Amino acid sequence: MFRLHSLSALAELAVGSRCYHGGSQPTQMKRRLMMVAFLGASAVTASTGLLWKRALAESPPSVNNPKSELGDKGKNKDEGEVCNHEKKAADVCLEPHPEEKKKKRSGFRDRKVMEYENRIRAYSTPDKIFRYFATLKVINEPGESEVFMTPQDFVRSITPNEKQPEHLGLDQYTIKRFDGKKIAQEREKFADEGSIFYTLGECGLISFSDYIFLTTVLSTPQRNFEIAFKMFDLNGDGEVDMEEFEQASCPGNIIRSQTSMGMRHRDRPTTGNTLKSGLCSALTTYFFGADLKGKLTIKNFLEFQRKLQHDVLKLEFERHDPVDGKITERQFGGMLLAYSGVQSKKLTAMQKQLKKHFKEGKGLTFQEVENFFTFLKNINDVDTALSFYHMAGASLDKVTMQQVARTVAKVELSDHVCDVVFALFDCDGNGELSNKEFVSIMKQRLMRGLEKPKDMGFTRLMQAMWKCAQETAWDFALPKQ
């Protein structure tokens, strides 16, 4: 079709040109020939455009050519439905493994967006992190609005390489009007009844004050809370009331000011992200009872911390779309290395080791994953125990790791979990663990990167240089004896 139109148009142009330059035709004929030539060129352009549009419609989708239609405009509705059914059937037959689905999403644009979001997690203030990763703005009946995170948003805000959903970003939210009955019906959507997020109120949603409190709980070691409770337990009975607890763990307190989040936070009334004077009403009721006259023991608070860590780990596990309650070995390795800070080339090599060892892996259940992370909670004691083995000349093999887990953390590590860990950290392939690298990476994984300072180090570098210059000048000023 394109070839016929082109040949006819060129023939018309050739005839018109000869007649025009020959001078044998009158002026009216020349104009008529020019009009025919113009119409022929227009027909060629139109036919070329139609053919190009059809070629785009029939080509597979790509980054620059997203497929938005299933056929030409001339196709009727029934043909479109048949195509849809055939496409769905083909997708069912050729449905890839869940891990393969996740590989296809990381294009060039996605990688750059994830790098930008990782910088936000690493260097931005808590206010900006919250405003970027929160996805809901609830408007109440008087017209006042407040921004909230869902539990999934909270996990995404502390997990590297987890991309924010499209069209949601800094100060971009999904708007929800306050309707008590409707919100109550959607409660299960945000948090399960057994989840610690359910106790926060607001249907399991997380306000800015809750966000700071939860990150403080996650980033503070258990030993620090034990010391803080003893400091503010004035009568020494092992219990604190609400006033004493607010001094120890709420806005403006000692513990929060020692965390990287707390040191970076500044109240910003313009954005509405200011820390309130106390815990939310749901948490105070959870800790101190309905009348707020109860006592909180360190045992109960550490149980709250344990439940929070369990719920966050559960959300991380479910994010990998487990099949029959299991995730793949590579996904488990990704969970272990998420906060490692390992260079990309080495990270790729470690992932290839897993792929080589577990081509047809049997997967890991949540119970196996939770047991290993319970083992990691005692990583300092594990480090000491492994050092003793190393100094005694014993090899750090899988049996040794299982023995340390039983002795230190009181958990059983399955043989399959140990196989995955050794495939990651057995650098020379001799069946022995690289102790230092394993412990350093696992310490970062336990704290989820929340203990790192939220700056690029320039201020600390200048302070160190200034201190060095002062000491050097003082040494020059003093006479040598």
Curated annotation (Swiss-Prot):
Principal localization?
Answer: mitochondrion
Q: Which InterPro entries match?
A: EF-hand-dom_pair (IPR011992), EF_Hand_1_Ca_BS (IPR018247), EF_hand_dom (IPR002048), MICU1/2/3 (IPR039800)
Residue span of region C-helix region: 460-470
Q: What keywords are assigned to this protein?
A: Calcium, Calcium transport, Disulfide bond, Ion transport, Membrane, Metal-binding, Methylation, Mitochondrion, Mitochondrion inner membrane, Phosphoprotein, Repeat, Transit peptide, Transport
Can you tell me which residues bind Ca(2+) 1? Answer: 233, 235, 237, 239, 244
**Binding locations of Ca(2+) 2:** 426, 428, 430, 432, 437
Concerning its family, UniProt says: Belongs to the MICU1 family. MICU1 subfamily.
- The protein, known as: Calcium uptake protein 1, mitochondrial
Q: Source taxonomy lineage? A: Eukaryota, Metazoa, Chordata, Craniata, Vertebrata
What gene name does this entry carry?
Answer: MICU1
